[in-house]
Amino acid sequence: AIYSASKRIEHYLTVENDAIDVDTLGTRQLGDMTIEVIDPVSDYAELMQTLFDFDCIHSLINSGLFRMRFDAMHAVTGPYARDIFEQRLGVTPDTLMNAEPSEDFGGGHPDPNLVYAKELVDVLYAGNAPDFGAASDGDGDRNMILGHRCFVTPSDSLAVLAANAHLTPGYRQGLAGIARSMPTSQAADRVADKLGIALFETPTGWKFFGNLLDAGKA
């Protein structure tokens, strides 16, 4: 829907004004338009609390029976991880790795795979390894999931998440459908078939997933 609307734009208007201070929360006036500066970290964390059972996860994390690591790779997800995992779920400080965003990603490459997230991989394959590990990329839309000395391929993690989504409060009624890009394996297809829901294969690109999300199909 958004993509279709963008193709109908015929002109746009500009207005001269002082720069908006995006570091200060609150509302500002720009001509006849009101601009509100929000805290996306807080808003995102509050949304996640409606989708997942934070009380249950908090109990697991603080039971002494489960340990995890998350590598933000010095990218955008660091502040989100601190808010959710540290402040709301109560993980220990050493749970989060590379959680401070850096313009050069700490000199690394924020691609969550076995090569560039080697620091996390080494932890998960060590003698006293945690039970769960994850890393996310530069803008937080791709991830790598690890178990205790176990690597989960991204296509399989999509299938596992889809198969178990009904166990979370936000998706208790089930999924409308599953979408995957063409390079992704067909593991998710098997889940969709088992659940009796639609499976959409798209070209690579968020605009294709966005259209399905806007239409309520995935």
Segments and roles (model prediction):
Residues 4-42, 148-218:
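Proline/glycine-rich low-complexity loops and linkers
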Residues 93-94, 134, 199:
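Generic structural signal for residues in well-ordered beta-strands
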Residues 69, 131-135:
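Short glycine-aspartate micro-motif
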Residues 73-79, 140-141, 184-186:
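Gly/Ser/Thr-rich loops at beta-strand to alpha-helix junctions
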Residues 128-130, 218:
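Short, high-confidence coil segments that cap the C-terminus of an alpha-helix
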Residues 137-138, 147-149:
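Short acidic-glycine loop/turn motifs at beta-strand connectors
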Residues 1-127:
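Gly/Ser/Thr-enriched, mixed-charge loops and adjacent short helices
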